[in-house]
Structure formats: C-alpha cells, structure tokens
Amino acid sequence: MPRWLIQILVMSVCLLWMPVRAAVPLGEPAAPVVIKVGPERAVKTLAAAAKVAGNRAIIEVDAGEYVADVAVWTQEQLVLRAAGGRVRLVAAGASAEGKAIWVIRGGQVSVEGFDFSGTRVPSKNGAGIRFEKGQLTVRDCTFINNENGILTANRPDLELRIENSEFGFNGQGDGQSHNLYAGAIAHLSVSGSYFHHAKVGHLLKSRAAVNYIVNNRLTDGVGGTASYELEFPNGGVAYVVGNVIGQSTTTENPHLISFGVEGYTWPRNELYLFNNTLFNPLPDGVLLRVSPGADAVKSFDNVLVGRGTL
C-alpha cells in the first residue's frame, strides 16, 4: 500500500476513533438543568454544585479563583464549563477522597476552561483530575504543579479525550507520577496539547489499549528533568502523528519514546509514527525504544533533529 494512502487512513482513524453515542436516551428527555456557580450565585461552590446536580446537568462556573473547592462528580451526563473567563482551581491542601481536586466517576462528562493546580495528598499520588468511570472529554484546561495532572483508574471501559490543554511541572519527583498518566483503559486521545517540564516523571504515559496522540507538542524545555517524553509501557495500539517531541539536555532519561518495556498486555501491540519532529540534543540520546514482541512498528516521514535514528 502506498505510504501516502497509509497516512491518510491513519489520520482518518485518529479523527474518528471515539464511537458515536446518542447524547441522550431515546424518547423525550427533560432539558438539562443549568446550575450557575460563583460567589454571587445561590450555589457558591463547586462542592455544593456536585451535591445538588442531577444526572443531566450543565454546571457554569463564573471566572475567578476557587480555593480548596474540591468535588466528586458521579452524574451520568454532565457538562462543566467556565463562564466569562478562566476558572482557577487551587488545591491549597484540600483533596476529594484524598485523591484529587476533582474525582470524576460518572458517565459522559465534559470539562472546559479550568486551571487545576497545587494538588498534594499523603499518598503522593494526587491529581488535578482523578478519572475513575465513564467517558471524559477535557478541553482548554491546564494542569500545573500537581503530583499528577490527570490520573486514571485501570478500567477497560474508560475513554479519555484531551484537546487543546496544557500539562506542566507535575510530578512528585519520585518518577512515579506524571504530567498525564492513563492506566489500562480502552481509549486515549490527545490532540492540540502542550506537555512540558514533568518533575522526573513522564510528559505522557499511557497503558491504554488504543492511543491517538495527534498534533501535540511534547517538549521538556530548558532545565527540564522529565524521564520519557512519551511512553506506552504495555504496548497497545498507538498512533503518534504530527507531533513535536523533544527532550532537554538535563533529562533524567535519554529516551524520547518507549514502547512495551514493561511487557505487552494487549491483544494488539502496534506503533505508528508518522509526520513527527523528534528532537534529541544529547550525544547519546535514543529516539525510540521498542521491546521485542511488537506486532508492528511503522515509521514514515518523521523529521529527526540531532543525533539518533529510527
């Protein structure tokens, strides 16, 4: 099959990976209930909104800073969005269930326009968002200076989509926490996002069965100490397309991308690297590390800057 045709097919799959679901059940469902949150509103905190919201709700949060305002979301259909500007969620020592600023354990949930920062918990595994159940879309959010940016449970039915977001300076510093850590879930899609300056951990780590990493910037930056820029420790199917991936001269690990180093656990284990720019400033840096046993490894039309080959 011609190389150009393979690339078109891969890009088409990347755009269409998530199955289309009916937004609401058949019949005549009630209109969503809109709950407005803010210091001048009847519902003043997100914690209060989480308790009163039903299974079909839109939460609109007034712009501003919300300190120690943590919540658990269990609704089946939920939209959380900032209104009138950014909403800054500062942990300030608080956490929901000892896990995160937000624990999301519901159905179809979307989050847009929030800045998550400062999460610290006794287990040293705190997150801006702990995602434990359902299908979650995160759009136009930032995750800065948490122990993990987003951390998921290990559930084979979870689906996580991230769009146009930023992850930086997350990590406990022990190499066990990361900017983004997707566990053994069904699907991960990340597009248009910026990952940088993980504290010893990875910029992006995923154990998902299927991964679409498309049109992102994963660069550790000046003074960065991240380990891998991109790791799939258990393989799976990974489409890595159109990204800029680069490491720092102060990195903790000379490898940019790693695949299958903890053993292959999924029925299919395939890596596709198309149209990326890979930057390695180190004399002994390694662009790609793949453990033996992968079903397929394909690399086309990547730009390599610095030392190293594919």
Residue positions per predicted region:
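Positively charged n-region of N-terminal signal peptides that target proteins for export
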Residues: 1-4
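Bacterial N-terminal signal peptides
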Residues: 7-16
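Right-handed parallel beta-helix/beta-solenoid
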Residues: 17-48, 52, 65
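Right-handed parallel beta-helix/beta-spiral solenoid domain characteristic of secreted/periplasmic
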Residues: 34-36, 40-44, 58-63, 69, ...
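Glycine- and acidic/polar-rich repeat regions and solenoidal domains
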Residues: 71, 88-103, 116-310
